[in-house]
Amino acid sequence: MGRTSGVEADAGKHINYMYTPKQFLITDQQEAVSFMQRYSFATIVTVNDGVPSVTHLPFIVSQRDDKIILTSHFAKVNPQATEILSGKPLVIFAEPHAYISPKNYESVNSVPTWNYIAVHAYGTATLIESPEKKAGLLEQTIQFYEADYLKQWSALPADFKLNMMKGITGFEIMVDEIQAKKKLSQNRTEQERQDVIADLSAKFGTEKGIAAYMAGLR
């Protein structure tokens, strides 16, 4: 099973790690997996000759024999479709987030901050290249994101689907390390946290998501 970790490292040590103070560390791997599955549109980072490449992709997050598997596909012309095999790709899951106003704090000697949840997943990639396996990948993706579309997809002409699949490169990443962080005002007083939750709950978008996660902390 991939390990879940957080590191408070000195500068120059473990530079590939996400900075995570202990009170913000997610130590439960299943909690991290559930977050990744809920917020599955992520950012994949690879490095080639010291230069990072980045693509934003929807992922299928699954577990197989106690291993976390991340599955997605690139446009075939995307250079990352080949770069992913070199080194250790990083996939970043980073929603929701919210601005936190100091008006919610008891002391006037306070400054704004940002609450968020983020999971960084590292692993080893393999390509999914055969038409049969790519078809399976696409059906799995449709099943997760819009199951009602499966019937229409199945009815599409075979040559049309084959041409579509020629334009993509599927891949899966077997995760060997997870770094997970939830910065949800754990370092504030209970009254301040409740005031932040009330403030965020009255807003829209990702603020409500952070409020819900904060309310779930006990």
What are these model-predicted stretches?
Residues 3, 9-218:
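Binding-site signature for planar aromatic cofactors or substrates
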